[in-house]
């Protein structure tokens, strides 16, 4: 008869205690990481559209890439709603995280203040003369696919990481960069296209990013 198995003691008692950073120190460390990897600093397409030096083909391709970013991200918003740490507050009005993401999702879908955000991106491509079938069959760049689904990996893994990756590192940084205003003005001035999507995002991402900063300090 084989020897009976033994329940192994896996507790590592010789390990030192890990001390969490203070909120201020953690946020400062996070800000340094975000600053070192800020995509808006190295992006050459946005300023080229802003000053009118981008070809129309580049402008169209950027619009198609942006459509898929919105198409893939929007269905993930309910994860932030359902995973919010105060989702079971007495009422939604008593919550912060839950109420914020519920409003954010409603806004993205066109039920709160602005038009549906994915539809705005479709209208952006139509304004540039891109047929719907071309948009439907377009294959986004690997960089677009990788960046979107890396972010969604964190959204799916935990609320805290989703808040940090999407709300703080993306929406807040996007709002601070001023990219939406640059694109709105550049497209209107140099390509005779007025894009509602960028008009909306020039204020919406700033507002959402500010709220994400406050929520980050509360988790």
Regions found by a protein language model. Give the residues of each.
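Non-heme di-metal
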Residues: 2-219
């Amino acid at each position: 008869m084989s020897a009976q198995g033994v329940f192994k003691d896996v507790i590592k008692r010789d390990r030192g205690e890990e001390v969490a950073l203070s909120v201020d120190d953690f946020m400062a460390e996070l800000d340094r990481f975000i600053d070192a990897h800020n995509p808006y600093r190295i992006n050459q397409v946005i300023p080229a559209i802003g000053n009118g030096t981008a070809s129309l083909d580049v402008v169209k391709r950027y619009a198609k890439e942006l459509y898929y970013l919105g198409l893939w991200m929007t269905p993930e918003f309910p994860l932030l709603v359902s995973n919010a740490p105060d989702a079971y507050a007495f009422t939604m009005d008593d919550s912060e995280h839950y109420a914020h993401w519920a409003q954010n999702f409603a806004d993205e879908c066109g039920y709160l203040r602005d038009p549906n955000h994915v539809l705005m991106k479709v209208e952006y491509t139509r304004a540039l003369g891109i047929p719907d079938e071309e948009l439907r069959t377009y294959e986004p760049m690997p960089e677009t696919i990788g960046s979107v689904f890396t972010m969604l990996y964190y959204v799916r893994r935990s609320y805290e990481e989703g808040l940090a990756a999407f709300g703080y590192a993306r929406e807040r940084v996007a709002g601070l960069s001023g990219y939406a205003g640059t694109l709105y003005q550049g497209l209107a001035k140099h390509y005779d296209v007025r894009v509602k999507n960028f008009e909306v995002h020039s204020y919406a991402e700033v507002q959402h990013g500010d709220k994400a900063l406050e929520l980050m300090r509360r988790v």
